[in-house]
A protein has these predicted regions:
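N-terminal periplasmic/intermembrane-space "pro-region" immediately following the signal or transit peptide
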Residues: 2-7, 25-54, 361
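Compositionally biased, intrinsically disordered low-complexity segments enriched
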Residues: 5-8, 35, 122, 200, ...
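Sec-dependent signal peptide recognition
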Residues: 5-9, 13-17
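Bacterial N-terminal signal peptides
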Residues: 14-27
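Short, solvent-exposed coil/turn segments
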Residues: 31, 70, 99, 151, ...
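Outer membrane beta-barrel
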Residues: 37-179, 189-191, 197-206, 260-262, ...
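Outer-membrane beta-barrel pore domains
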Residues: 61-63, 82, 107-109, 129-131, ...
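Active-site cleft segment of glycoside hydrolase catalytic domains centered on the general acid/base Glu
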Residues: 183-187
Length: 361
């Protein structure tokens, strides 16, 4: 009974703190415009259908082995039912061979700068992990986006947009902590949350700060992320650092970093619009997914283990865009891995050449 009371008290306090912070900041933003139109207010209820197809060929240079893969076959439906209520549902028909429900949420905008989202979504955390597949610069994601900070969950989030001389976006939410599966019988006494602030400075500069608490198993995990980028005149320069801490010293702290630079070059051709050379460096220390293992299987009798060994990677390549970038791209990359002594490289995480065709519709 005491634990239940503590959980409820903690939950209410967290929600109240987020709400109070947003209410205090509201006067700084642009003047709110009410979206409370009448039931007969005009709104286009036509659903919008979008999708992303990513097909690629990878060749591992050391092993002399190659494979074709459909990495993503995503389809999404979104739209509005009233001037201030919208929705989105997204499914991946082939996420490395598996079918996954990704987004399923309703969004309410009672006033223009404020939005509430309830359902399953990508939590507000990091820069690179928050990118959709068609928005990625490289064929394979960074270590931050793939191993360390990639989280979708079920919960409720609030976002507030304001202008303090430059645009600022604040987001915060409470989530199950269960991930995409196991919702039906998942009950928790812990509070899992995420918060993110994006500052869009003049001349294409951005600073993003975020934090997140999850509890994949019996161990609480806190993550802190700081990233910045400059996007202007065809250039994109970005750097991001993530720090991950496990409670009760269940596993040593994890550090992850990535930095890259790209340059869109117009070709003047009617078919091939842009050629983009780009290069990336990313790094991660030994990493645990937060679950206990015994004899290679998840078990409450086990302990946290190294799921991803310490490594760094250098990636270089070219992207060929047949429309504006991130619509119809061919990505050609070479990845060079550097593992620590004694590390075991997974089959798909070795030196390789990647040729990917991405189509967004």
């Amino acid at each position: 009974m005491t634990r239940t009371k503590q959980f409820l008290t903690s939950s209410v306090a967290t929600i109240a703190s987020c709400a109070a912070a947003l209410l205090m900041l509201m006067p700084l933003g642009a003047k709110a415009q009410s979206a409370s139109a009448s039931d007969d207010g005009e709104v286009d209820r036509t659903p919008h259908i979008h999708g992303t197809l990513r097909c690629k060929y990878e060749y591992q240079t050391s092993e002399g082995e190659g494979r074709f893969e459909v990495r993503n076959a995503r389809v999404s439906v979104d739209g509005k039912v009233t001037p201030f209520i919208s929705y989105k549902a997204e499914i991946d028909l082939c996420d490395e061979g598996s079918i996954k429900m990704l987004d399923a949420y309703t969004r309410l905008k009672p006033i223009q700068p404020l939005a509430f989202t309830v359902g399953q979504m990508r939590v507000p955390f990091t820069i690179d992990a928050h990118r959709s597949p068609h928005q990625q610069y490289f064929a394979n994601r960074s270590f931050i986006a793939k191993q360390v900070g990639n989280v979708r969950d079920v919960g409720a989030a609030v976002a507030y947009n304001m202008n303090v001389g430059f645009p600022v976006v604040l987001e915060a939410g409470l989530f199950n902590g269960s991930g995409l599966t196991g919702q039906k019988d998942y009950w928790t006494k812990s509070v899992n949350f995420s918060a993110k602030a994006q500052l869009f400075f003049p001349r294409g500069f951005n600073l993003t700060l975020s934090m997140q608490k999850i509890r994949p198993d019996h161990t609480g995990v806190m993550m802190y992320d700081a990233g910045a980028y400059w996007h202007a005149q065809g250039w994109h320069v970005e750097g991001e650092y993530l720090y991950k801490h496990y409670s009760n010293n269940a596993f040593h702290d994890v550090h992850a970093f990535d930095a890259f630079i790209s340059r869109d070059i117009r070709t003047g051709s009617k078919a091939l619009k842009f050629v983009t050379p780009l290069v990336r460096y990313d790094y991660m220390s030994d990493h645990s997914d937060g679950s206990r293992y015994l004899d290679g299987k998840k078990s409450a009798e086990g302990s946290l283990i190294v799921n991803d060994y310490k490594r760094s990677r250098l990636t270089g390549g070219l992207t060929f865009s047949f429309a504006k970038p991130f619509i119809s791209d061919i990505r050609l990359n070479y990845e060079k891995y550097f593992y620590r002594s004694g590390a075991i490289a997974k089959p798909s995480e070795r030196d390789k050449i990647v040729l990917e065709v991405m189509t967004r519709f």
